[in-house]
């Protein structure tokens, strides 16, 4: 997003080489905890940088999707404390999760937690757009873009906001 194409391409090549080693040689999945990073590895490297990821693309997935699929297949089970305090959670779907179509997995995992009272927020951009909202000259615009989301969060009376994107998390915390 800052025009450093050559540096980005070199880093992407290093990343994909490491991913290929994990996937092709060791048979391991590659799990991301960031929707943006996962989307970049799977879809943006080929699209923006011309780096072929087709041989490993399907082995790169979001951790919540991976965990959900383990639970659904019976390969893992969840246990919860019976005395856990109730927590009101508002879930924000990041823009890249919309693109991946994977918000379902995070939402369903949150629903599995008995002590969670979940509110799924209407899908709205938080305004951060990677590093865009961190730049002084873009701050006001970034906040204006996210204003509707921030109002939604306040209206829920939630204790916690959950999201699958660290930059969305930072924007929400700052606002």
Language-model features and meaning:
Residues 1-175:
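Iron-sulfur cluster-binding electron-transfer modules in prokaryotic oxidoreductases
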